[in-house]
């Protein structure tokens, strides 16, 4: 399943939330690449184990619309079906933009996920972590907001 992981730069490095998603994607053997968003000129986000595209945004603007447009183009051109981001302000904004662009709902509060016969199965936390439920996502484009551990 072709996958896009949306990451962020934190203090010059790829965020821990993105690294968690990358590790899980590698564990599942997903074909993925990372799009990293940040305001820095030369962040330390390289890796030999995955492709990374750095999207520099303007730190004086609140809107991530231009970044979302670039991500939409990536998803379209590469036939990506699974898009994931850490549950941060940037991750939530970008997943929201993309889910509207592709008319597909997002699943939030994901604490774990698996792939079964081309579908994504998520475990989600609700009620402050007191309850957990599972979702089976069958849509063409699957949008997940992953809660950090």
Tell where the protein language model's regions lie, with residue ranges.
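N-terminal glycine-rich FAD/FM-binding segment characteristic of electron-transfer flavoproteins
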Residues: 1-149
């Amino acid at each position: 399943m072709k996958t896009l992981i949306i990451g962020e730069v934190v203090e010059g490095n790829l965020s821990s939330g993105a690294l968690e998603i990358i590790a899980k994607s590698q564990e599942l053997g997903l074909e993925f690449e990372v799009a990293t968003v940040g305001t820095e000129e030369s962040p330390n986000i390289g890796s030999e184990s995955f492709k990374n595209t750095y999207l520099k945004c303007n730190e004086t603007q609140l809107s991530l619309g231009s970044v979302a447009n670039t991500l939409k183009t990536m998803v379209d051109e590469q036939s990506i079906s699974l898009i994931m981001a850490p549950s941060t302000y940037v991750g939530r904004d970008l997943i929201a933009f993309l889910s509207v662009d592709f008319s597909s709902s997002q699943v939030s509060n994901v604490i774990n996920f698996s792939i079964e016969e081309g579908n994504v199965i998520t475990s989600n936390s609700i009620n402050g972590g007191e309850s957990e439920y599972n979702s089976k996502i069958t849509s063409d484009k699957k949008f997940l907001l992953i809660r950090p551990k």
